[in-house]
Amino acid sequence: MAVIGGGPAGASAAREAAQRGLSVLLFDHAHPRRKACGGGLPVKGIEWMDAPESSIECEMTSISFTFKSTKLKIPVNKGKMVRRDDWDFYLYNRAKEAGAGHIVERVTSLELEKGFWKINGKHTAKYVIGADGVNGFTRRRLMDRIPREHLFAAGGYYLGIKPTENEVEFILGALPGKEGYLWVFPKSDHYNIGYCFNAGTLGMKEALHKLMEERWPGEFVDRKWKLSETGETVDCKQFGSAIPSYNDS
């Protein structure tokens, strides 16, 4: 089996397959690296992945949902925050420890030959798991282009202010468009702020910058924009029985 993409989904799939006795190759061209992601994990997920305490940044104390001027805040103590680069690298190493082989290269070709998949012209696998994301090679190789109106865009920011409370926030109705939301996740020494919205919405980035300047004055680092599919346009039949697709949401 070959797993293309070594993020949480791909690394976990490779680990499980290796533990069950399968011969596994895990492809990823770069580790570790930061991503536009809040880094929040439920307790069940942390328990299943045997997360070490060193990978936990802080524990959630509350979660809130805000729509325009109305806010609902709920005390909780069952969620934890991780840094995606550290967390991804930990899971990647666990997959290797379980027996998965690792190929440090970008997948650029995938061809089906006599019932086996040929990867980059030199690696062979009976089955392939595509876990390299909506913009990854697997999806682009096996599916048609997804129309922009069926895509959501996501952007992530790191705000250099130490949180005074470990409150996870989800904010709706504060930015242009009818779809999407803004998230605010506390970390040990900064905030992770991001947003998810329909890619066709105009003026989103400018509106977000204005909101951040008003609510969180200070320095922040603009991360690159990423595209993440809504899931509504994916026809699984286009993958074929040998190519499941996974993501990290």
Task: Report each predicted region and the residues it spans.
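Glycine-rich FAD pyrophosphate-binding loop
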Residues: 2, 6, 15-37
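Central beta-strand plus flanking loop segment that forms part of the substrate or channel wall
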Residues: 40, 135, 140-170, 216, ...
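Active-site substrate-recognition segment that forms the wall
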Residues: 172-203
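Conserved beta-strand segments of alpha/beta enzyme cores
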Residues: 23, 101, 224-226
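FAD/FMN-dependent oxidoreductases across multiple families
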Residues: 81, 109, 201-249
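Conserved N-terminal helical subregion
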Residues: 47-48, 52, 56-141, 147-153
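N-terminal Rossmann-fold NAD(P) dinucleotide-binding loop
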Residues: 10-11
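Conserved N-terminal glycine-rich FAD pyrophosphate-binding loop of Rossmann-like flavoproteins
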Residues: 30-54
